[in-house]
Amino acid sequence: MSRRIDYYDDPAAPKANSLVPSVNVVVVNDAGQVLMIRRSDNDNWAVPGGAIDLGESMAEAAVRETREETGIDCEISGLVGIYSDPKHVLLYTSNGEVRQEFSILLTAVATGGQPTPSSESSDVRWVPREDLASYQMDRSMRLRLGHYLAGRSGSPYLG
């Protein structure tokens, strides 16, 4: 199985060979719960997201990725931040691609659908905000969710 390995400020990390604009989406339901997926490629919990395709806006990509990975339809409602730390690289073992992080974190409200796992997610669930800290996730996802929970959408993170 193909894996994703995240490296943070690691001198032994492979050098990045690509930069792919991507989106992540904090989707919230009427109860205030956050939509989370368990990633198939590293078994960590994360918000849905993925690469922006050519000819697609970031909002369109966010809605598409959320639907593909979770079965949930959503409407984009805000921006939390832009994450582009060159010290964070992601190795994809299937093809040797090493990406420098470049992700835009958006907020959204759920508008329909049922949580449904996909080939990219082994589990999909609504998580109460107060339970997020107990979920296993990589450092950059924890940082992003921390910014969301702190209410950064009024003052986006740029880093």
Model-predicted segments: where are they?
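Active-site-adjacent beta-strand/loop module that shapes the phosphate/pyrophosphate-binding cleft
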Residues: 85-114
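Conserved Nudix-box catalytic region and its N-terminal flanking loop in Nudix hydrolases
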Residues: 29-72
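A short coil-to-beta-strand element that immediately follows conserved catalytic motifs
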Residues: 73-83
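Short connector loops at helix/strand junctions that flank enzyme active sites
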Residues: 20, 40-42, 47, 74, ...
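Short, well-ordered beta-strand micro-motif
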Residues: 27, 105-109, 128
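Acidic, metal-coordinating catalytic segment for phosphate/diphosphate chemistry
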Residues: 1-24, 96
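Nudix hydrolase/Nudix homology domain
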Residues: 43-44, 114-159
